[in-house]
Amino acid sequence: MAKNYFDITLALAGVCQSARLVQQLAHQSQCDEPPLRVSLQSLLDLNPPSVRAVYGDNPANLRMGLETLQNVLNASSREGLGAELTWYTLGLIVLERKLNGNRGAQAELSRRIDALDRQLSHFDLLSDTLISAMASIYVDIISPLGPRIQVTGAPVVLQNTQIQAKVRAVLLAGIRSAVLWQQVGGGRFQLMFARNRLFKKAKQILSHT
């Protein structure tokens, strides 16, 4: 059965969007709000009718992620900001595999996200309350699976507890996209042997956004 590279590329762009948001937060103490909202919202729909639906039914919502994916696929340097994006992306993919092999963690994650959905009727998605709840899910369920993702940035920024919470919430959203990527046929071999195909598909999707 032929793989759907549109869905695979879109879900992987979701992972990369989280990577870029983490990088922005770690270095600048802030990030672009529209893609942040899209990424965090993706956490709350665990039974979507399509991959597009996870991201607001509009690939343009993943423009940041698609551009970051192209950068990751093109990255030749192992240093600097490009390397950070690659490590964050790969780190999220590795953690998803750990989650996939742990039924207990999956069940607890589903339960906690259901509770998040209920809170959304009382708080805005980007409120400190919901961001903190998402961060707690990451700390309680994802972090213990290991290996931990080492976030690099400005030390004074990374010591800020609100930034720490946002980073963890965004990493949780990245895990959600990594789960989706696997569900639609994504795999690590594509990052080695289908890089050109993924790059072209990302470019094609971007040209229509």
From Swiss-Prot:
It is found in: Cytoplasm; Cell inner membrane. The keyword Cell inner membrane applies. Keywords: Cell inner membrane, Cell membrane, Cytoplasm, Membrane. One of its GO terms (cellular component) is plasma membrane. Its main location: cytoplasm. Disulfide bonds: none annotated. The keyword Transcription regulation does not apply. It holds the Pfam family DUF489. SUPFAM superfamilies: YcfC-like. It is a peripheral membrane protein. HAMAP family: HflD_protein. Belongs to the HflD family. This is High frequency lysogenization protein HflD homolog. It comes from Sodalis glossinidius (strain morsitans). The gene is hflD.
